[in-house]
C-alpha cells in the first residue's frame, strides 16, 4: 500500500511497482526455483533476484493492487546472442496489455541509463521470442515423468519410457540463424 499511496490510476500504480523493483532489487542468479518456498516473496525480502523472480514480483504486486498481470518468457535473440529470459505483461485501460521487463530495467538503472530503464516499462525491444505465456505451464504433449524444469521451461525436455532425462544427459543448443528487419 505504501508504494501506491495516493495513486488510483492502474498504469501509474504499475509504474510505481516497476520503479521500486528496478531501483531497489539487484540482479542475482537464483537457486533452482523448487528450492524457494515463495519466489516473489524471496525477491522482495532479499532485494535480489533473477529475471524470473523480478517478473514474478512485479506480477504479484500488480495483482495485489487489482491490476491484471501475467507471465511471458522465452528467448532474448539478437545477432550473435540467444539466451533464456523472463518478463511480464500487465493490463492498463485504455491501452490494453503492456510489457514490463524489470530485470532489463534494473540493468539499465545500474548502468545509469534512465531512458532505457523507462523504455522497459510499457515496451520491449524487438529481439524476443516468446515461448511461455504462463508460469508453471504444462507442456502441450504431457510428460509421463518428473520434469527437469516445471516452472519455466524455454529449451525443452526429453524422457525415455522409464524416466525423464536430466539436462546433462542430452545435447541441446540454440543459435540465431538470421535477423532481418521487417517493415
What are these regions (language model features)?
Residues 17-20, 27-29, 33, 58, ...:
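Sequence-level detector for tyrosine residue identity
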Residues 122-183:
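Low-complexity, Gly/Ser/Thr/Pro-rich intrinsically disordered linker/tail segments
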Residues 38-42, 83, 109, 152:
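Short, surface-exposed, charged/polar-biased interaction segments
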Residues 53-145:
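Hydrophobic/aromatic-rich core segments of domains that either
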Residues 1-46, 158-182:
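Secondary-structure boundary elements
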Amino acid at each position: 500500500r505504501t508504494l501506491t499511496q495516493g495513486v488510483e490510476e492502474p498504469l501509474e500504480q504499475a509504474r510505481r511497482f516497476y520503479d521500486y523493483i528496478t531501483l531497489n532489487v539487484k540482479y542475482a542468479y537464483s537457486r533452482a526455483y523448487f528450492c524457494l518456498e515463495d519466489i516473489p516473496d524471496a525477491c522482495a525480502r532479499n532485494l535480489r533476484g533473477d529475471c524470473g523472480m523480478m517478473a514474478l514480483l512485479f506480477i504479484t504486486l500488480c495483482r495485489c493492487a487489482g491490476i491484471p498481470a501475467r507471465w511471458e518468457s522465452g528467448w532474448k535473440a539478437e545477432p550473435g546472442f540467444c539466451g533464456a529470459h523472463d518478463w511480464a505483461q500487465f493490463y492498463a485501460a485504455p491501452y490494453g496489455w503492456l510489457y514490463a521487463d524489470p530485470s532489463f530495467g534494473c540493468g539499465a538503472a545500474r548502468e545509469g541509463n534512465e531512458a532505457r530503464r523507462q523504455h522497459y516499462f510499457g515496451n520491449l525491444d524487438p529481439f524476443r521470442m516468446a515461448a511461455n505465456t504462463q508460469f508453471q505451464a504444462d507442456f502441450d504433449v504431457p510428460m509421463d515423468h518428473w520434469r527437469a524444469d516445471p516452472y519455466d521451461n524455454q529449451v525443452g525436455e526429453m524422457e525415455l519410457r522409464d524416466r525423464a532425462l536430466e539436462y546433462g544427459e542430452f545435447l541441446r543448443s540454440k543459435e540465431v540463424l538470421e535477423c532481418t528487419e521487417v517493415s
